[in-house]
Amino acid sequence: MKLVFGFVCALFYSFMSFGQITQWTDINYANDSLEGHKLDIYLPDGGQTEYKVVVLIYGSAWFANNMKQMAFQAMGKPLLDGGFAVVSINHRSSGDAKFPAQINDVKAAVRFIRAHADEYRLDTSFIGITGFSSGGHLSSLAGTTNGVKVYKVGDTEMDIEGNVGDCTSFS
């Protein structure tokens, strides 16, 4: 009986906690079939016409390409409670593609957000970005390379902006 009561309480709490948010899951931001190119969008229960956005990037030492749900569970709820739309993204792992593919994916997700802002009620005048561990590194890199298309060190050049997805005009 205690087990059933505990289960019912947990079920009730889960509906109470997440029942009011609007969500879209597994949206492919690059118009391909890669797991590493999916994102989830969550809107708080506020009835606003649009919401400022925070992008979440998971940490995985760049080894995983499908942990966006974990990032939302860890950091998304407090952001929703603060009135922000939360976009939790996947990116290609280091096993799937070499650097700078991961930052190209992050920037492609941001371009997708800008291109589809009206559809998902997102206010792109403010797009924050955060993450933990390798996701924190990618969020810092995204912030410090905003507007930088090519990174050059000596004779080596890297395309930091990338051309992932259909929304390249929203860079």
Regions found by a protein language model. Name each.
Residues M1-T22:
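Bacterial Sec-dependent N-terminal signal peptides
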Residues K68-V87:
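Short amphipathic alpha-helix adjacent to the substrate-entry channel of hydrolases
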Residues G19-T49:
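N-terminal cap/lid segment of alpha/beta-hydrolase-fold proteins
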Residues A97-D118:
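Alpha/beta-hydrolase active-site loop
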Residues A61-N66, V86, F112:
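Serine-hydrolase catalytic-loop signature spanning alpha/beta hydrolases and amidase-signature enzymes
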Residues E50-A61:
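Short beta-strand element of the alpha/beta-hydrolase
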Residues S60, A85, N90-S94:
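Short beta-to-alpha linker loops that shape the active-site pocket of alpha/beta-hydrolase fold enzymes
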Residues R111-S171:
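Primarily recognizes the serine-hydrolase "nucleophile elbow" in alpha/beta-hydrolase
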